[in-house]
């Protein structure tokens, strides 16, 4: 009987161990499935990361190309900024050549030069060039450069007596100051 009891106890322990073993196998299988899922997710993340890196590299290359293209365009814009003005002056330049070649008398030459002067002045005016008023104006250091001072009884102190060289603005910006003689008493 003791043997039967001992054997029953061993059978019971074996059953319990078998159940624990089966539970552990199930748990191990479950953990292996979780690990496989984690590895799968990790691989997907690696692929996505690689895609983002590739995209980032392509965007960087595109941006560098964009910068180079824009730099070239900017240089071309600066290089050829005066092209419309040159085209407008070319007609007058060619007229001057013809006037010099074809003028037989001094009057013909003068008439041709006056016509050309008028055309050039019109072109420059259309481009926004304006003369700075000087003679009889109050001296303005932002528009005029005083080269000389003189005392003139007919002119108020601080006013311009004579314009020695014309000054100009281009679309409101002074590009050449008027050179003047100013009255100083």
Curated annotation (Swiss-Prot):
CDD domains per record: GrpE
One BP term from GO: protein folding
Keyword Transcription among record annotations: no
SUPFAM superfamilies associated with the record: Coiled-coil domain of nucleotide exchange factor GrpE, Head domain of nucleotide exchange factor GrpE
Domain of life: Archaea
One cellular component (GO) term of this entry: cytoplasm
Main function: Participates actively in the response to hyperosmotic and heat shock by preventing the aggregation of stress-denatured proteins, in association with DnaK and GrpE. It is the nucleotide exchange factor for DnaK and may function as a thermosensor. Unfolded proteins bind initially to DnaJ; upon interaction with the DnaJ-bound protein, DnaK hydrolyzes its bound ATP, resulting in the formation of a stable complex. GrpE releases ADP from DnaK; ATP binding to DnaK triggers the release of the substrate protein, thus completing the reaction cycle.
PANTHER family cross-referenced by the UniProt entry: GRPE PROTEIN, GRPE PROTEIN HOMOLOG, MITOCHONDRIAL
Stated name of the protein: Protein GrpE
Higher taxonomy: Archaea, Methanobacteriati, Methanobacteriota, Methanomada group, Methanobacteria
GN (gene name): grpE
